[in-house]
């Protein structure tokens, strides 16, 4: 297990390799378990249970095994490739952006607590692009560079994974901000509004 709390973790294969990082596991199972903050950039695939119980870290990886983002409560995860089964089981917070080139991700995501949406909102697009850019800058990822170089073609293939409760809260916060409340006050009022309606 490799939890992080702050800082920046960069994992990349050594120079001169003859395999494609995006097709090979480079970090094992339960990496970033219980991570609370910081950033991780992995040029390659993670094993099973990647970012389980992540509560605030940001991670970019090029594929994950089974049970990725399980019980995640916060943070952001970008997956630039395939996932295993049962992705996002019990996920109640945070956001994941998953590249779904074969249009079959819906078969591997656990839809009990999350929805799948296209990445269309300007904030999501900017966040996704910036994280991929940072990933390429730090790891030299060929896969990341390929996606960045043709971003407008790849963007429609990404899915945003968002927990239902979290999505509802974000919408209530946005409506409070539209009424003129600033960020923190909007969050407080949204919390009370949601609690009142339970």
Which residues make up each language-model segment?
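Long, distal/terminal scaffolding or interaction modules
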Residues: 1-198
